[in-house]
């Protein structure tokens, strides 16, 4: 196994190749599923996306009063960012903005202030990242 592959498996680097402000290569061979991605984004147990972001004002997220306002709205995310840009923002947004409050959702090493239950664990697995990307791409 090469050094880069070993580091990627360890979580020390972003999985895949970062090109500019994105990660163009999917993390899995299975395409993302937008329906599963929507469930992750709306989940109050897994993704927790709506803790900081607001979602589209539609039947997708009827609980608008419980949505966050700390981070950019997810409405129109698929029009604002490419698939590669969305993927990198989900995997590790601090690669783009070191001061970002958004947690690295697919990195487990080199993080600070991580709760004991999450030490050494990724919030989302690779397929879940691809599912969220697929959902966000539908938000035009």
How would you describe each model-predicted region?
Residues 42, 79, 91-95, 134-140:
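Sec-exported extracytoplasmic/periplasmic mature domains
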Residues 1-2, 15-19:
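Domain-scale selection of a single, long terminal region
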Residues 83-91, 126-133, 137:
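An amphipathic alpha-helix signature
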Residues 44-48, 56, 128:
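Short pre-active-site segment immediately N-terminal to redox-active cysteine/selenocysteine motifs
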Residues 2-12:
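Bacterial N-terminal signal peptides
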Residues 17-44:
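Electrostatic cytochrome c docking/interface patches
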Residues 31, 50, 54-95, 101-115:
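Gly/Gly-Pro-rich "capping" loops immediately C-terminal to redox-active cysteine motifs
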